[in-house]
Amino acid sequence: VLTGDFNIKPDNRNLKELDKIMHSTRKIALKTDNHNTFNGWGKAKKDNVIDFIYVSGFSSCPEYRTVTKKYSDRTYVSDHYPIIARLIF
């Protein structure tokens, strides 16, 4: 499992190299979403997916999701949304 804020978009050539040896859970999950992963404290442009979970050696990924929950005392708890992947080994 390789996860993190890569600060590059999915079409970046470096990620294309990683795609040769690992799988993006956002792409392979049976259930997924299309939310941004970077919110920039509400100032980010659309189409900002720069956080990833890559895997190899798992039999499936039933679910990937971006947690975009809002809180009553603050809209954002970080400038990035958490991402979650459920994996079956």
Features from the language model and the residues they span:
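Metal-dependent phosphoester-hydrolase catalytic domains
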Residues: 6-89
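Residue-level marker for buried hydrophobic side chains located in beta-strands
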Residues: 1-2
